[in-house]
Amino acid sequence: MPHILIKTWFPPHKADEVANVYMEELKSHRPDRSLGKSLATSIKSDQNGIVSLEIFEVKEGKLEEVLTHYHDVQIMYHNIEGFRYEIEVWRTPVEALALLGMKPPE
């Protein structure tokens, strides 16, 4: 099962605005458990502002639905000046080995 990493950045002075949209997101856009599950959500600050990272484990055959869901969620933040995001698909080690025609020992 692949993992989706959703990383966002925003300026500290926009934190209240982002938090308000996030509260709305929690009410209206949580992914269906049939798509997978969130493994972790973390927040920190760095030289680029405030950064959040979510790791979502995708159930087999649900990748496109999950990507659509997270792109729809990020659209909620588009009017916040300075808000940026990145969505990445990461493979598990087993999936990466399969691309090479290999599998781990049992």
Regions found by a protein language model. Give the residues of each.
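Conserved short beta-strand edge segments in small beta-sheet-based binding/regulatory domains
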Residues: 76-91
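Short S/T/G/P-rich N-terminal loop/turn motif that feeds into the first structured element of a domain
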Residues: 1-69, 89-106
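Charge-dense, low-complexity polyampholytic segments
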Residues: 72-74
